[in-house]
Structures are given as structure tokens and as C-alpha cells.
Amino acid sequence: MIQMQTNLDVADNSGARRVMCIKVLGGSKRKYASVGDIIVVSIKEAIPRGRVKKGDVMKAVVVRTAKDIRRADGSVIRFDNNAAVLIDNKKEPIGSRIFGPVPRELRAKNHMKIISLAPEVL
């Protein structure tokens, strides 16, 4: 459950390290984002010579949440941290690598490029 003002780790090599959610996309009164949802983020911490810099406003896909994800078979999956992958306007990842595991739920939300770059799909 990601809402406005939530800080997230960045799970790609775009150059950003920490981002803050400033808007959850999808409806005027939408409060929370879960795995696979697109949010608008502000870059709070970035590495030198990265593709993005501190203060940039971008879109991102939530790939990990500390809140439980319930599956149709009754199982539950949760992660240690909240993480996102920065995307461009064509919904393609900005980075060329993804770090850490991502859940299968991204496939249902048509983020196939992120699934293919990820080292592990849970």
C-alpha cells in the first residue's frame, strides 16, 4: 500500500536511489497503490552521472511492497521493503537492469519488460 509521501527504494540502475510518491495514478480520488500500479515520484536521492538527477519528477511502477499481496489460491506474499522501477511515457523501464525479486502480478498488469529484466519472479 503506497500512498502520497511514501518513500520507496529504486530497483533499477537508472541512477536514482530513493524516490517519494507524490501521486497515485488511476482515478481522481485514488489513495493507495499496490504492486503493478503506476505512481508519480520525485527523485530524493541519486548517484552522480546517473540518467536522472535529484528533484526530477517521473513515473514509476511499484514492484515490491511491505504490505501483503493476496493471491487467488489463498497464499500471501510480502517483501521487506517498498520498491519501484522508473519508467518513461511509453511505460518502458529507464534502467537496463532490475535488482531483486518481483512478483508475478506484474505480468497481469502488462509490465512484461520489467518481468523479463528481473533476476527472479516470485
From Swiss-Prot:
Keyword rRNA-binding among record annotations: yes
One Pfam family hit: Ribosomal_L14
GO biological process, one term: translation
GO cellular component: cytosolic large ribosomal subunit
Record key words, sorted: Ribonucleoprotein, Ribosomal protein, RNA-binding, rRNA-binding
GO molecular function terms noted in the UniProt entry: large ribosomal subunit rRNA binding; structural constituent of ribosome
InterPro entries the UniProt entry points to: Ribosomal_uL14, Ribosomal_uL14_bac-type, Ribosomal_uL14_CS, Ribosomal_uL14_sf
Assembly information from the UniProt record: Part of the 50S ribosomal subunit. Forms a cluster with proteins L3 and L19. In the 70S ribosome, L14 and L19 interact and together make contacts with the 16S rRNA in bridges B5 and B8.
Protein function: Binds to 23S rRNA. Forms part of two intersubunit bridges in the 70S ribosome.
HAMAP family, sorted: Ribosomal_uL14 (MF_01367)
Family matches, as NCBIfam families: rplN_bact
UniProt record similarity statement: Belongs to the universal ribosomal protein uL14 family.
Name this polypeptide is given: Large ribosomal subunit protein uL14
Organism: Allorhizobium ampelinum (strain ATCC BAA-846 / DSM 112012 / S4)
